[in-house]
Amino acid sequence: MAKSHTLNPEEEFEEESGLRPSLLSEFIGQKEVLNNLTVYVQAAKNRKRALDHVLISGPPGLGKTTLAGIVSNELGTRLTITSAPVITKGADLARLLTSVGENEILFIDEIHTLHKKLEEILYPAMENYMIDLVIGEGVTAQMVQIPLKPFTLVGATTRSGLISEPLKSRFGIQLRLDYYNDEEMKEIVLRSSRILGVKIEDDAALEIGKRSRKTPRIANHLLKRIRDFSEVEGNLSVKKGLCLKAFEKMGIDDLGLDGMDRQILGCMIDRYKGGPVGLKAIAVVVGEEEKTIEDTYESFMVRIGLINRTPAGRVATEKAYRQLKRMQDFSENHGQDPTLF
């Protein structure tokens, strides 16, 4: 397996749990992405040249970092992992770029947060494997070109719209990860359970998958918690009934909504009659950062039809009222006869 080097792991990345797939053949779901990536990787191997630069976008927890590791393993090359928020100076980025060896991979997470001045250092690095540095100050300042070894930059982002067009256009390979379906989530849970040594029935794995917000990272977390409940009860295998009891105790409903999701929807319904309401107002009421609400909670609820984004603000849908069993409030907020519901 190719070696991996992580910068500031205590702040930016979870330790490898052994649950991440290490090869393309082990990755479940995202078929179109995998099929295309397999071709790109094989072509780079055949040419014995660096893979073109890769931009991977999509919601959190879908496998962006995992895919970077897989590409590294498939190519048999070293992977250096960092995150854009920890790169604050041009010298930091220059040190990173000059430390990357021939055909190696530099992975930058949250690349949309990279400062525009630092982006400008990346442009010649990505195009010509060269960085331009200014040495000295004032009239004695000189521009020095430092050659780099051919390398692959893999950028990951949850907000591709915030990446400048000049930077985005320099990624020859652009991949978008989407939420997983229930069957894919079930297979991910079954795979993880085998690695963890947890005996689990198919319908239990499906139940965990359905409540994991279509996100593998969450599925693995929930599987471990279900394992805790199962072991404490002395069960030999995980059954659906145990999962249902455990999820009720953890406050996770059949769509995967937790207490914060319900608090956000409740805020919209109780304080703003279902909306429209601005994200900032919601954040103040529930005591959470706007970015966290938008990336972690709202994006999923929009995807499954509980929240609509409109020019005037966020609106709770009829489905949201039904999920919270608050159709009486829906009829009152929308001036409809409650007997119809």
Curated annotation (Swiss-Prot):
Q: Which NCBIfam families is this protein grouped with?
A: PRK00080.1 (NF000868), ruvB (TIGR00635)
Specify which residues bind Mg(2+) according to the UniProt entry for this protein. 65
Query: Where are the annotated coiled coils located?
Result: none
The domain-related comment in the record is: Has 3 domains, the large (RuvB-L) and small ATPase (RuvB-S) domains and the C-terminal head (RuvB-H) domain. The head domain binds DNA, while the ATPase domains jointly bind ATP, ADP or are empty depending on the state of the subunit in the translocation cycle. During a single DNA translocation step the structure of each domain remains the same, but their relative positions change.
Q: Does the keyword DNA-binding apply?
A: yes
Q: What is the lineage of its organism?
A: Bacteria, Pseudomonadati, Spirochaetota, Spirochaetia, Leptospirales
Chain segments carrying region Small ATPAse domain (RuvB-S):
181-251
Q: What is this protein called?
A: Holliday junction branch migration complex subunit RuvB
Per the UniProt record, the source organism is Leptospira borgpetersenii serovar Hardjo-bovis (strain JB197)
Q: Which UniProt keywords apply?
A: ATP-binding, Cytoplasm, DNA damage, DNA recombination, DNA repair, DNA-binding, Hydrolase, Nucleotide-binding
